[in-house]
Amino acid sequence: MQRSMKRLARNARRISISAIYTGAAVMLCAHSAKAEFITLSDFDNTAVVTDLNSLGVPTPHIFATPLKVGIYMFTTDSGQLGYGASGLNNSNALSTTTDLGWMRIDIAPSAQVTKFGLLVGLPGPQQHNHEAVLFFDDYNHLLGGTGVSRRGGFQFVAFENTEGLIGSVLIQDADLNSSSFVVDNLVSQSHRP
């Protein structure tokens, strides 16, 4: 009896793992048909770049969140956003204010954004960083996620939802390095009917 219980438990574990992998594969296949990662070259001349250079305050500056910039609403884990010359080519950009912090960027549904991308990272070649970047549709369903891992500088991360809208992006600092992370040059494009 005890032997058959052990066999049942071992088989149940195999079945559970198999069910998890199968379910994950089905979910990925379902989403891959309507959403995918893209590059900067996938945006056309109707794309709008929000470079965050001129938010109307002297720098450096700390903003309370939520902070609205055009079609974007920024929130963070700490309730604050740093603003200063930490962006691409030392331009002004927004950053978290805590190590291992997160930043959520909600996109106004009225903007009808189907493609969205941004630069994520830290300035300078010696600023090692890791971030998880998750894209959501306008119903807060996960479209996809990726990791950014660099020895310094920025990486452009972008996503397209071909069957709906991009609703938000969540960036999570994943590197315990006593540093925050920076976002710059938000790129959006809409295909309105």
Task: Please tell me what each predicted stretch does.
Residues 1-14:
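N-terminal secretory signal peptides that target proteins for export/translocation
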Residues 17-27:
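Bacterial N-terminal signal peptides
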Residues 34-190:
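Surface-exposed, well-ordered secondary-structure segments
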Residues 11, 23, 105-109:
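Generic detector of short alpha-helix boundary/capping microenvironments
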Residues 30-32:
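N-terminal signal peptide c-region/cleavage motif recognized by signal peptidases
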